[in-house]
From Swiss-Prot:
Keywords: Methylation, Ribonucleoprotein, Ribosomal protein, RNA-binding, rRNA-binding. This is Large ribosomal subunit protein uL3. GO terms for cellular component: cytosolic large ribosomal subunit. One of its GO terms (molecular function) is rRNA binding. One of the primary rRNA binding proteins, it binds directly near the 3'-end of the 23S rRNA, where it nucleates assembly of the 50S subunit. InterPro entries: Ribosomal_uL3 (IPR000597), Ribosomal_uL3_bac/org-type (IPR019927), Ribosomal_uL3_CS (IPR019926), Transl_B-barrel_sf (IPR009000). The gene is rplC. GO terms for biological process: translation.
Length: 212
């Protein structure tokens, strides 16, 4: 359990190494991650560091959150995220102070979690990669239908989790073991190799990889 950061997805580009090999990277802007609360085992039952990112109008902030931010003496934030840390690491952090980008280094492997792009209502072929049925030989208007979804009188219901048509995307998903290609401390940019879930401007949670 180690500290992470919250950033915003800027988009994708490519960079070149010393040999001229191009690599596709995702650019993440790391806005100030201000510590809004420190949780300890004595008061909360576990050790964690809570960070606040972005800006929210006071008129758009609930009274509960407004009081929470006022207690930490920080401005209202758009997103609050919590990272569990070890008891030895908790002493390094202080409420009201930012978490620095220096906690990561180039070449390090990280796990990224974000909300995927919503695709709206989609059928089973697009949503779940179903094969589809025969195009000819007796098939009548059933080319893209999923087929049978039920059982017999027993159990007489459709099992939970059955792959069917519905809203595609707009779900929290994770990509593990992504390499940090480059870090720009001056501009607070993190360049990650490959793609990252979510749309441009979406919030991305980055933490050290659990499988590295």
């Amino acid at each position: 359990m180690t500290m992470g950061l919250v950033g915003q997805k800027v988009g994708m580009t490519r960079i070149f190494d010393e040999e001229g090999t191009a690599s596709a990277v995702t650019v993440i802007e790391i806005q100030p991650n201000i510590i809004s609360q420190i949780k300890t085992d004595e008061t909360d039952g576990y050790h964690a560091v809570q960070v606040s990112v972005g800006h929210r109008k006071s008129s758009r902030t609930t009274k509960a959150l407004a009081g929470h931010f006022a207690k930490a003496n920080i401005s209202a934030a758009a997103l609050v995220k919590e990272f569990r840390v070890d008891s030895e690491e908790i002493a390094k952090y202080e409420v009201g102070k930012p978490v620095e980008l220096a906690i990561f280094e180039q070449g390090q492997r990280v796990d990224v979690r974000a909300r995927s792009i919503g695709k709206g209502y989609a059928g089973t072929i697009k949503r779940h990669n179903f094969r589809g049925q025969r195009k000819t030989h007796g098939n009548s208007v059933s080319h893209r239908v999923p087929g049978s979804i039920g059982q017999n009188q027993t159990p007489g219901r459709v099992f939970k989790g059955k792959k069917m048509s519905g809203h595609m995307g707009n779900k929290m998903c994770s990509v593990q073991n992504i390499e940090i290609a480059r870090i720009d401390v001056e501009r607070n940019l993190l360049l990650l190799k490959g793609s990252v879930p979510g749309a441009k401007g979406g919030y991305v949670v980055i933490r050290p990889s659990v499988k590295a």
